[in-house]
Every structure is written in C-alpha cells, then in structure tokens.
Amino acid sequence: TTFAGLCFGDLSPTSGKVDISISGKKDLNVGYLDQFPEHLILLKTTNELVTELKENQIFDSSLDRTFRKRLNRFGIQWDHISNTKGVDLPWAVLRIFLLILLCHCRFDVLILDEPTFGLGWDQRVKLRSFIRECMNHLHFMIVSHDKVFIRSICQQVIDLDELDSKHVRIREKETTKP
C-alpha cells in the first residue's frame, strides 16, 4: 500500500523521487484503486460516481455500454446497483465495480492495490481474464501479496519482500496455467 501510494503520488518519499514513465513519456494519466475500495466512492451512489467521472471527462462515455456488459460478466447488474451507495454494497461487488469502472477511464496506468483481496477463486479467475483484455490499451501496476495471481498475469515482478539495501529483484513473467 505504501509503494502504491508513492507511485500514485499520495505519499512522498523521505528522499529521492518516484517517476513512472512509459516509453519515455512521463506526463501520464494515472488512476489508483486503493485496497479499501470504499475510500474512492465514500457515501456516493455508483451512479453519482460514474456521473462525476463523466462530467470531469475521466470516464470514457463511448464505453458506457461495454462497461455495463463487463459488469454483467461478473454477475453485477447496473440497474440493481446504480442507486446504491458504495458503503451499502457487498465489499467484493464494490471492488469489482470500481475496478471495471476505472478500466473504462482515460488512464495510461492504473495502479491496483490488493485487487484480489476478499474475492473468491472464480472471481479471481474472471478478474485475471478481464485484466488481460484491458492490457491491450492500459498499463497496470499491481501491488499484491497474492503471488499466484501476480505471477500468472504480470510481465515483470518486483518482489519487495526480497528487497535489500542494494537492489530490487525483477523477475520476468513465469508461465502458469491460466
């Protein structure tokens, strides 16, 4: 969570700086989904949040229909949640809703902090498939203790548990069964 906060800019390092770039481009639109999804929506309804993102030209309105179809893939019906406050939704539903929503926004990079926390096996499998689809147009930084999930989806892994004062170990993607 601290690492995600440093990358997103919510936190400042005591020394040095954190830069994120893609092919030399540093002026990136970066989104962030906290490991506690209720922090993003607070007391708003899901519809109020989507409307706010549309008004601020963050949500890509041309993807509204696709967004709703993708919610359906996870068993989430927009008509059933649109007028529900985020704090009144089951935690797993809120997490999936926000993740799918942010993947339809105008971000170059989306930082996901513990995206599988609180999800069952089937939801994790669907989530992995969904994120892989989104990788065609969006870069992800995933911060997680779920090493099986990370190694099944990420092209590079920085294992901060193996961090020492001299280096961070970076592994190329390991092959696992989907």
Language-model segments: residues:
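Conserved ABC ATPase signature
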Residues: 85-89
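Helical segment within the ABC ATPase nucleotide-binding domain
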Residues: 124-136
